[in-house]
Design a protein with these regions (language model features):
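Conserved aromatic-histidine-acidic binding/catalytic patches
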Residues: 51, 55, 59, 110-111, ...
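Short, hydrophobic/amphipathic alpha-helical patches that form generic packing surfaces
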Residues: 35-39, 124, 208, 212
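Long, amphipathic alpha-helical segments that form or neighbor coiled-coils/leucine zippers used
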Residues: 173-200
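Short amphipathic alpha-helical face segments that pack within enzyme cores
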Residues: 62, 117-121, 209, 216
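Metal-dependent nuclease catalytic cores that hydrolyze phosphodiester bonds in DNA/RNA
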Residues: 1-98, 105
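Amphipathic alpha-helical coiled-coil segments and their boundaries
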Residues: 200-210, 214
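Extended, charge-rich alpha-helical segments
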Residues: 212, 219-281
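Nucleic-acid nuclease catalytic cores
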Residues: 53, 69-167, 171
């Protein structure tokens, strides 16, 4: 990792940036508030650079050049902006516009909400700018699209209030936010303390009881599946295809070395299940 990138990452830890606000809003598919807290408090392992990240940085000038060519607006770079704990790493400014460059393998049916949140966050640094543009290059077909994000001062104020509260409540206080997933729990508590005991509250006792029921049900289902698999295999013997009296294919079983495969989708479809069952699964 280059010294410049290390410095950039260190600066990001000093506050909430555009990609961070989407995490706090629950929009990010990549990180949770626990991930963010571990990062901001210096507890997270450095995220290694990867080919996708490098490609995005390398293509950014090309995306911005395409934007300038298509819109006729010149673009300029301004670097990192800091307003207390609020941080913005804006890709570029154009006349009357904040511009964020994105690359994606495939096109979008709609702009990902975490990108919209990022641009809205950046608009908060420029009171007179009413629109942010997401300039997106799609690598699969080389197409280029511009998606505008209109300023909403109420949303920006809410974002800043949320960021301030979260920063004070968790980063300044050095208290982890509530975990949202099993992965969060593993990240927060990487090892247990021998012989340490906690008393289960009512909700947890209910979960333990439900877990026992579900595991017992899962075992029953697994045993039932195995029983029916055996019945089909025993009937097929060395045949590859099983059909009904009308000749319609019910199942196939191919054995290659030590592997076996039964086409259970074909079995299910041949049994003409009700539409409600299909919809439920």
């Amino acid at each position: 990792m280059s010294a410049n990138r290390e410095q950039w990452l260190a600066e990001r830890r000093k506050g909430i940036g555009g990609s961070d606000i989407a995490v706090l809003l629950g929009m990010s598919p990549f990180r949770t508030p626990v991930d963010l807290w571990l990062d901001k408090t210096g507890r997270a392992d450095p995220v290694p650079d990867n080919p996708s990240m490098r490609l995005g940085r390398e293509l950014e000038p090309a995306v911005l050049a395409r934007y300038a060519e298509q819109t006729g607006r010149g673009v300029s770079h301004i670097g990192t902006l800091v307003d207390g704990i609020f941080i913005a790493n804006v890709d570029a400014l154009a006349p009357g516009r904040v511009v964020e460059a994105k690359t994606s393998r495939h096109g979008w049916d709609d702009v990902p909400e975490w990108y919209r949140a990022q641009v809205m966050w950046y608009l908060g640094f420029f009171p007179r700018v009413k629109t942010g543009d997401i300039a997106a290059l799609f690598l699969m077909d080389g197409s280029f699209h511009i998606y505008p994000v209109e300023r909403d001062d109420e949303t920006i104020a809410g974002m800043r209030e949320l960021a301030t509260d979260w920063w004070n409540r968790y980063v300044i206080a050095d208290v982890a936010p509530p975990p949202m997933s099993e992965a969060d729990c593993k990240a927060l508590w990487k090892s247990h303390k021998a012989a340490k005991t906690v008393v289960a509250v009512d909700g947890v006792r209910e979960s333990i009881g439900k877990l026992k029921e579900l595991k017992a049900e899962a075992k029953r289902i697994a045993d039932e599946i195995e029983r029916h698999e055996f019945a089909v295999m025993r009937e097929m013997r060395d045949a590859e295809i099983l059909t009904g009296p009308d000749g319609k294919k019910l199942a196939s079983w191919k054995q290659n070395k030590d592997s076996e495969r039964v086409d259970w989708q074909a079995v299910a479809e041949a049994m003409n299940p009700p539409q409600e069952l299909i919809a439920a699964n």
